[in-house]
From Swiss-Prot:
InterPro entries: MOase_MmoB_DmpM, mOase_MmoB_DmpM_sf. This is Phenol 2-monooxygenase, stimulatory component DmpM. It catalyses: phenol + NADH + O2 + H(+) = catechol + NAD(+) + H2O. The gene is dmpM. GO terms for biological process: phenol-containing compound catabolic process. Keywords: Aromatic hydrocarbons catabolism, Monooxygenase, NAD, Oxidoreductase, Plasmid. It comes from the Bacteria. It is an enzyme of class 1 (oxidoreductase). Active as a monomer. Formation of dimers inactivates the protein. The multicomponent enzyme phenol hydroxylase is formed by DmpL (P1 component), DmpM (P2 component), DmpN (P3 component), DmpO (P4 component) and DmpP (P5 component). It comes from Pseudomonas sp. (strain CF600). Disruption phenotype: Cells lacking this gene cannot grow on phenol. GO terms for molecular function: phenol 2-monooxygenase activity. Its EC number is 1.14.13.244. Belongs to the TmoD/XamoD family.
Length: 90
């Protein structure tokens, strides 16, 4: 089984701020730009932090907001008000 986790977003203005935050918080992540889609993958774990997204957006942000732009995910999800984590728990 692959140990890569991934998340793919529609390529739009809202998602670009989230992608930027993911890259800031996960320097090991690989970003792939496709037509109308941005896919981010990483070995074993990706963390999306509310605080980083809020800094990029310049406003308050609820983690649930990003789900409107999510196309697909791969990995086990651990989510609370401050973060959204994808990882494989073996």
């Amino acid at each position: 089984m692959s140990s890569l986790v991934y998340i793919a977003f529609q390529d739009n203005d809202n998602a670009r701020y989230v992608v930027e935050a993911i890259i800031q918080d996960n320097p090991h992540a690989v970003v792939q730009h496709h037509p109308a889609m941005i896919r981010i993958e990483a070995e074993k774990r990706l963390e999306i932090r509310r605080e980083t997204v809020e800094e990029n957006l310049g406003r308050a942000w609820d983690v649930q907001e990003m789900l409107v732009d999510v196309i697909t995910i791969g990995g086990n999800v651990d989510e609370d008000d401050d973060r959204f984590v994808l990882e494989w728990k073996n």
